[in-house]
Amino acid sequence: MLVALPIALAQGADGERVKTEVKRNLQGSLSWSADETQQALQIEEVSVTSQPAGAMFDFLVDAQGTMPAEKKAIFRGKTFGVLSLGFNTIEMMVAEEGHLVEKHVAGETAGVRRLLELCNPDRAYSLGELDSQLRAGKLDITAALPRWQREVLGQIETHWDKVVRRFATVIVVGGGAFLIRDALLAKFKDRLFLPDDPILAIARGCYKFALYKYGRE
C-alpha cells in the first residue's frame, strides 16, 4: 500500500513519527463489510510519501509503470517544481537532480477552501454547500477569485522566489488548477504542465509509482 500525506505531515518536524504511525496502523490484516459481504485484506508493506510526490510521479511515469528516457533526463538532471492546489492546502515541492530541495518545501492552508470563505463573508452557507455549488458551476466567484489568485501567487513568490527561474517544468495539480489556469500560464508560460485530470493526478501518480517500484506482481 502506498499512502500520500499532506506535505506538512510527511516532511514536517514530526514527519518520521507520523510516517511510522501510519505504517503501524495500516499494515497487517484489515476486514470490513460492504454490500452485506465481508471483505478481508492482508497488507504486507506500507510506503508513505507526500501528495506532491504523487503528482510528480504522475508526470514522470507512464501508465505501464515505466519512466521514459526523456523523463529520466528531467528527473535526474533538471530542476522542477510541483504545486498542488487542493481544497484545504496549497503544497509546494522542488526537486533538483533527483533530490528534494527541503528549503523550498511548503504547505499553506490557503487552498480552494479559502476561495469559498471569501465568497461567504456572512457564513450563510456551509463549506459543503459552497463546494457543491462550485463543482456544479453555480457559485459566483467573480469578486473573490482575483483576491484568491493574488494570494496563491503571493505564496509562490514567498516560498519559491527566484528558484522559479531554474525550473524546467512546473507541475500543477488539484482542483484549484482549473480556477487560475490563465494566471499560472501567464507566470510559467511553456514550462507549465497541467495534467489531463489535475484532480486525480496525485492518486494516479501513486498508482504509477507503485507499478514503477514493485511491478505488476
What are these regions (language model features)?
Residues 96-98:
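Short acidic-glycine loop/turn motifs at beta-strand connectors
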Residues 1-80, 102-112, 139-169, 175-217:
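Nucleotide/phosphate-binding catalytic cleft detector across ATP-hydrolyzing
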Residues 54, 87-88:
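Short, glycine/acidic-enriched loop or turn micro-motifs at the edges of active sites
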Residues 82-86:
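Conserved catalytic-loop position in the HRD/HxD motif
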Residues 112-148:
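A mobile "lid/hinge" subdomain adjacent to the ATP/sugar-phosphate binding pocket shared
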Residues 90-94:
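Short beta-strand scaffold segments in enzyme catalytic cores
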